[in-house]
Regions:
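Sec-dependent N-terminal signal peptides of Gram-negative exported proteins
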Residues: 4-25
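Zinc-dependent metallopeptidase catalytic helix centered on the HExxH motif
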Residues: 127-204, 209
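Zn2+-dependent metallopeptidase catalytic core
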Residues: 28-57, 62-131, 137-154, 158-166, ...
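Structural helix-adjacent loops and short alpha-helical linkers that scaffold large soluble proteins
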Residues: 92-94, 144, 185-190, 225-233
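Extracytoplasmic/secreted proteins, especially bacterial periplasmic and envelope-associated proteins
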Residues: 69, 73-80, 84, 145, ...
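Beta/coil-rich, acidic/histidine-enriched accessory regions frequently appended to metallopeptidases
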Residues: 28-30, 34, 245-422
Length: 422
């Protein structure tokens, strides 16, 4: 597992991971149980066509009618993903079944093209560890789509082995981050569209697997911004998320979560005294210039007369609202007065991004407010060369507890925004 990270608290050796995990576990303010432990049952059939890799402990089982060419392509894609995961990324391979083999079942109707499922807990492991098997959709086009699908399955199998207690939303997002590193030909991303079309939602949303795969935009951004090498920070999250679940429990241990690890590891990462709240706020601004673009809560012309806008959708913790203000018609010496109000018990961070006609962010201006406040205001000046502004409101969590992805449902908060020429 890689340890070469820019974040000092993640760049540690294995003997120190355990004490680090104990520390981050204490930062979670909830006693939330982890995901349910639900071992899957491999599909059954009378006429499976079996083939095995000659390079890795992988065997596939194809339902009748699967072409030999597709069976061969699946094994080749699995071998390539296995090689890159365990080679360049230095991550552990999936744990197979009791026979020591990782099994693939070529069937129909698999979301994402392929997916690894929990087989069984390892009763001998000191920390939680699990074996897995994978389902592969027989309709997946050969070539890059099949490579990406098998990369998703192999990486998810590695995660089952390393940190099986991670919530499904975070798992899908992190798996997608590494799978796209492995699959260099991957292009087009409908999942990213799903993620960017709902910026007000929490960064992980158990109601939509497409949204959660798209949330790789967040984990990829964190990895690029703070990691020492591609994929290193995501793998560091796995290493620092070991759990101990009692035998016979119905749910995995609830801590530490990936966000517990980030909360400790990214302290002071942006500036001295910065926290994970500041990381959430920075990502909310940066996603405004990502492709595909996020859906704006409002888009308005230059407000020569003050306008008062209400949130069309309340913002969940770790989510954000983006309001676009076009500067067409604004005078050369224009100034914009921004006044934000939001509901009690929500902690929001507001900022303004100046963007040129090419979509490049020229400047980011934080709108200061004290902790637990429900009001913030600023006047934005020096708008020469600016095509439009994004006013961004990020919900960084409630005043009562830190964000826990295992909670599954989070209370969103609304806001009111007053914008007018000053």
């Amino acid at each position: 597992m890689k340890g070469s990270l820019a974040v000092a608290s993640l760049a540690i050796l294995f003997p120190r991971w355990l004490s680090g995990a104990d520390a981050v576990a204490q930062t979670s303010s909830q006693k939330q149980a982890g995901p349910a432990i639900e071992p899957a049952v491999p599909p059954s059939g009378d006429r499976w066509q079996k083939a095995c890799s000659v390079r890795h402990p992988i065997c596939e089982h194809a339902t009748a009618g699967t072409t030999p060419a597709f069976q061969l392509a699946v094994l080749e894609s699995a071998d390539r993903a296995w090689d890159t995961l365990t080679g360049s990324l230095e991550a552990p391979p999936p744990d197979g079944a009791a026979d020591g083999v990782w099994h693939l079942y070529l069937v129909d109707g698999v979301d994402g093209g392929a997916h690894a499922l929990l087989d069984a807990r390892d009763p001998r492991a000191h920390f939680d560890r699990a074996s897995s098997f994978a389902l592969v959709d027989r309709s997946t086009p050969q070539g890059c789509p099949l490579d990406l699908a098998l990369a998703r399955a192999v990486v998810r199998g590695s995660l089952w082995r390393t940190a099986p207690a991670i919530d499904e939303g975070s798992a899908l997002a992190q798996v997608e981050t590494l799978a796209r590193l492995i699959t260099v030909c991957a292009s087009g991303n409908e999942d990213a569209v799903a993620f960017q079309s709902r910026p007000e939602h929490a960064l992980v949303d158990p109601s939509s697997s497409a949204f959660d795969r798209g949330a790789s935009m967040f984990f990829g951004w964190v990895d690029i911004t703070f990691g020492g090498s591609p994929g290193a920070l995501v793998e560091g999250l796995w290493a620092l998320s070991p759990t101990r679940t009692p035998a016979g429990a119905g749910s995995w241990a609830g801590t530490p979560t990936p966000f517990d690890v980030l909360r400790v590891s990214l302290r002071d990462a942006l500036w001295q005294g910065s926290t994970l709240d500041d990381v959430f706020a920075r990502f909310a601004i940066d996603r405004a210039s990502m492709d595909p673009a996020p859906r704006a809560a409002w888009r308005i012309a230059w407000p020569a007369r003050a306008r008062r806008l209400a949130a069309p959708e309340p913002v969940a913790p770790t989510g954000a609202s983006l309001i676009r203000v076009d500067l067409d018609g604004a005078p050369p010496d224009a100034k914009l007065h921004v006044e934000a109000e939001w509901e009690d018990y929500g902690r929001m961070r507001w900022a303004v991004a100046k963007v040129d006609a090419g979509g490049r962010v020229l400047a980011q201006i934080a709108i200061g407010s004290v902790d637990r406040a429900t009001h913030a205001t600023i006047t934005v000046e020096k708008l020469g060369g600016v095509d439009h502004l994004f006013v961004v409101g990020a919900n960084v969590g409630t005043t009562e507890q830190t964000f826990n992805p295992d909670q599954g449902e989070w209370e969103p908060h609304g806001w009111l925004l007053t914008l007018g020429a000053d």
